[in-house]
A protein has these predicted regions:
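Generic structural signal for well-ordered alpha-helices
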Residues: 25-32, 70-78, 104, 156, ...
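Acidic-and-aromatic substrate-binding clefts and catalytic sites of carbohydrate-active enzymes
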Residues: 2-8, 14-27, 93-102, 123, ...
Length: 215
């Protein structure tokens, strides 16, 4: 896998957002064996299915009742933990980076600790959830299907000027060899500067003594 290879070579850290129903037994075992200090995994929706009746795609949006969302969140968590041998962080990334207030409420009730969405997403009442925003989408600035490195550098620099913690989102399933090569070069550059620290999303979560969630 290009993502895990790049991370290991550059001593960076990553958080894989995993779709529960898309993970096979074999891939789950392979991924679980690689989870550690530098590679973490968390829940990415349930089946990555669009339930929006109109407008932009959304699996956990306002068109779904909280009971339906609650059930999918719980089932997804249970399935993911079975496949990844219990090595799942209490973080949720909604498909298409969109979710509703009902989603946040259900996540709190189930004991999740973090919610990762686009930094510009509409505000939600997060309760006990820690916001873990994405500031830069690697796949957004493109030049002829290749990464626009100048635009990416500018976006990252601007985010670093504004924020003490910057989230960079990858789409490893659709990234090209050139994407991985460029990403590896970026990691090497950032590390060489000596002023950037790579941290896991899990490390940004507040400490907790107990979780309410049940499998």
């Amino acid at each position: 896998n290009g993502l895990t290879n790049v991370d290991c070579r550059r001593e960076a850290v990553g958080a894989a957002a995993v779709i529960p129903t898309a993970l096979s037994l074999g891939t789950g075992a392979w991924l679980a064996s690689r989870i550690g200090e530098r590679l973490r995994c968390h829940q990415h929706g349930f089946a990555h299915v669009n339930h929006a009746l109109t407008g932009r795609k959304c699996e956990f949006g306002t068109d779904r009742a909280i009971d339906a969302q609650h059930a999918d969140l719980r089932r997804g968590w249970s399935l993911l933990n079975q496949l990844l041998q219990g090595r799942v962080d209490e973080i949720f990334t909604p498909p298409w980076n969109r979710c509703s207030q009902a989603t946040a409420d259900a996540l709190c009730e189930l004991g999740f600790r973090g919610l990762s969405r686009d930094a510009g997403a509409a505000p939600l009442r997060l309760g006990s959830l820690q916001s873990l925003p994405v500031h830069v989408n690697w796949m957004k600035p493109r030049l002829d299907a290749e990464p626009d490195l100048h635009a990416l550098a500018a976006m990252i620099a601007e985010a670093l000027r504004r924020e003490s913690e910057v989230g960079l989102m990858l789409h490893h399933a659709v990234m090209t060899d050139r994407d991985f090569e460029s990403f590896g070069e970026l990691l090497a550059l950032l590390r060489s500067l000596g002023v950037v620290e790579f941290v896991t999303m899990r490390s940004l979560l507040p400490a907790t003594d107990a979780l309410r969630r049940t499998a």
